[in-house]
Amino acid sequence: MPDRNGKIFYTSITSLSHISKVAGLTGSIGISLNDRELLSCDSKMIAGMLFGKIKQAEVANLHIELSLHGLFKKTVTPETEWIEAIGILLDNAIEASPKGSTIFLSSKKQGDFLELTVSNPAPPLSNTEFMALFGKGVTTKASRDGHGFGLYNILRMTERYHGKILTRNESILNENYVVFGVLMP
């Protein structure tokens, strides 16, 4: 019998039957927390880059945990600058982290600014030690060739856009993590 729109009711029952079958087949499939965070990211370029970094970390036997609670595209800072900062901070964390550990990347809105931080397990650093790492040509790597410009470039970016450098030590599950980040308009 047709409904008031002229459609036959049994097609709806058939569609519901198909939906139930599909739901039954996919019931055990879930979406990971990182995938959920990537899908919620307002910048598909940043989400794509983060996906690549997650895969890079997995190859190095590391885990990256994302917590994205800010809109990159709603800031004064261009997406390309965010991509550079995220890439530098994650590359440094991946290189410095012991195998099997977790790196945390977080973004959140702070008033008119977006705070981005990357945390990785490491011995505690003093404020002086943190800030010295942002000097031009300063590196912790054995080979100095072509190194020592990442954090310096982040410092220059914060100066260009009137942002701030964020550094601190943080205890996560009784382990020290060093936190590097930016607060950008």
Regions found by a protein language model. Give the residues of each.
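Glycine-rich acidic phosphate-binding loop
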Residues: A93, S119-P124
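Conserved glycine-/histidine-rich ATP-lid loop and adjacent helix of the Bergerat-fold HATPase_c
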Residues: N153-I165
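Conserved ATP-binding N-box helix of the HATPase_c
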Residues: D3-G6, E79-I103, R160
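Short beta-to-alpha transition helix within the HATPase_c
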Residues: L38-A60
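Short conserved segment of the HATPase_c
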Residues: L125-G137
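Short beta-strand/loop element within the Bergerat-fold HATPase_c
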Residues: G100-D112
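Conserved short strand/loop->alpha-helix "switch" segment adjacent to the catalytic nucleotide/phosphoryl-transfer site
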Residues: L38, I64-A85
